[in-house]
Amino acid sequence: MTLKERFLKYVAINTRSDENSESFPSTAVQWNLLNALVEEMKLLGLEDVTIDKYGYAMGTIPATKGKEGAPVIGFLAHVDTAPDMSGENVRPHIIECYDGKDITLNNALTMRVADFPELSKFVGHTLIHTDGTTLLGADDKAGVAEIMTAAEYLMAHPEIEHGKIRIGFTPDEEIGRGVDFFDVKTFGADFAYTMDGGYEGELEYENFNAASAKIAIQGRNVHPGYAKNKMINAIEVACELNNLIPAVERPQFTEGYEGFYHCVGFNGTVENATISYIIRDHDFEKFEKKKAWMYDTVGMLNNKYGQGVLTLTLKDQYYNMRKMVEPHPQVIDNALAAMREADVEPIVRPIRGGTDGARLSFMGLPCPNIFAGGMNFHGKFEYCSLNSMEKAVKVIINIAKKWAE
């Protein structure tokens, strides 16, 4: 099976995760792809192929003769797609030798170069895009397809020397639960890489420190005709809180290493309201200050409206993996060298998000993130470059070789 065939097969399987579910995986449909990957690994001849009760699918490419003592390297990707948009009945469209012009997704929707100027970098590439009614699922089925294609190649070419390689596929990454039950010891890798990045050349070993904040507001509903000095409108209190957030510290005004507060949900009546945020910053000190600001602001509003009107629940989600990866420079050096040997110019920059690898790094498995070739994740404008995906396969193979040198 070719890389392209694999990818098209995988995106046809709905694997949308659900943040409101309490099961794990959060949706039963994820098992369809996970079980298919287990069978495919077995057909390719991988050893120690397993899937546990949580849906973690793993397999081993055994070390070539004489390289059994090399570090064990892992490659990981997640099978779920974001709950932001439907991943069911995905109908990919393929453009051979993209000409750099606007792309018609359907009769009512066009992906314009003016809106997505990075399209101009893909002239001459084979692009795979949506029909405008679903997301594509390149995040992260591009990574899944690349790992499986590299595994097939290495199994078929024993002359390529490498140590033991472990590959793994996880559910529920998109809702932040991807490695909640992942057994690092069972996986058995010394170092690993997630194939979950975007643009060709991306190598990321810095990510946000992340927290979630949920504020419940207890209002006081009184007939509006007689509400003076009595009513507390929970909706207006929520709006007041939101308006206190510095405008420049919102996602649409930040880039690079700049953190933010992002309102991700609101539900309310005069009597009750809830407003939810995610808090992000690469710098831990700034991250802590952002959390402290939220506590202080809620306290200030409680002083204004009455103690107990606002109740804040704030939880840390994950941390910047940099401090866990930097003590192992070979992890980055080998990835950089592998990219250059694949004729890929490395782009080292911080992830403005998080990956399974961020949490795994704090669980004892240093795990930076490598490009998978997709763009515009989580929505109807998602697309990927088959050329970049092919480069990612070469990078995986080259990394395997590098660790055995």
Show the residue positions of the predicted features:
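N-terminal capping segment at the start of a domain
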Residues: T2-A28, I128-H129, N221, Y318, ...
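Active-site-adjacent substrate-binding region
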Residues: E236-F253, F260-H262, V309, Y319-P368
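His/Asp/Glu-rich mid-to-C-terminal helical/loop segments that flank catalytic regions of hydrolases
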Residues: N32, I232-P251, E285-M300, D333, ...
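Short beta-strand
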Residues: D48-K53, G265-N267, R349-P350
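Midchain, well-structured core segments that form catalytic/ion-binding scaffolds
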Residues: I103, L119, H125-A138, D172-N302, ...
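Short, conserved micro-motifs enriched in small and acidic residues
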Residues: A28, T134-A145, K228-E236, Y383-E390
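Active-site metal-coordination/substrate-binding segment of hydrolases
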Residues: K67-K164, F169, A189
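A non-catalytic alpha/beta surface segment that caps or lines the substrate-entry region
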Residues: E22-A70, G74-L76, D80, V90
